[in-house]
Amino acid sequence: MTVIRSWLYVPGDRPDRIAKALAGPADAVIVDLEDAVSVAAKEDARRTVLKTLAEGAEFFVRVNAPATPAGEADVAALAAASDKPLGVRVPKAEDPAELRRVADALGVPVYPILESALGVENALALATAHPLVAGISLGEADLAADLRATGADALTWPRSRIVVAARAAGLPNPVQSVWTAVRDLDGLRVSTEAGRRAGFFGRSVIHPAQIPVVHEVCAPDPAETAWARELLGRLESSGEAAWIDDHGQFVDAAIVARARWVLALAESGEKHVADPANSGPAPENDVTVAT
């Protein structure tokens, strides 16, 4: 099982930052052609993405909204390229038919971002629109603007809706939207912990300094990992379908599934080694705009 905890956005028109991001501690890199790139730089960014893919780099791409001229150009360029990204994030997703068109054209996993009231209303339809839909998420800044909503709890219902739609469609738990207060790492931790409790897993980030916090929140604690190993070891040795464990807890298929997930997270954390040189304080001019 591949577990991605951190998804780092990097501007598509900055090859220097792309190279740094690919060498850094993020589990996944998203080269952005949308919000992080000015209109004047869109074509240069597109060429940079194609060149970097041709060099063998592995990363995800966020295209512009498919209904826009820039989005149409992004999809056409990636569809024609012989070297494909690992997947494509599709912003402003609202129409399942449009998402199907993008998936058919690209032939790689697609990740619709729901950023409007209509997108949230169509969450399950988007999540099940095509076999290549690999995950759904919220674009919270745009969604809040569309809803004219403010306050910390304003998006509680849409967040729950996305979690339910993703799991109903058999998709992974949604990735949390970016935390835009880059210097507020304590706030990032609190928000990410709340998101994980609510059914999100992993987070989009806009600076390497945010990555260690996200990874720490995503990691199961040692006691939980030990519990999972013990439970799965007993299952393998005894083959029991259900039992009462030593702590008096009834163990059935749902608990076993939870243990497998905990162990997958623990093993994923062991495979990723962060580079401290790439995760220092966040300077204002080293931030990707990804809302």
Stretches with model-predicted labels:
Residues 1-291:
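Expand to "…catalyze enediolate/carbanion chemistry for C-C bond making/breaking, isomerization
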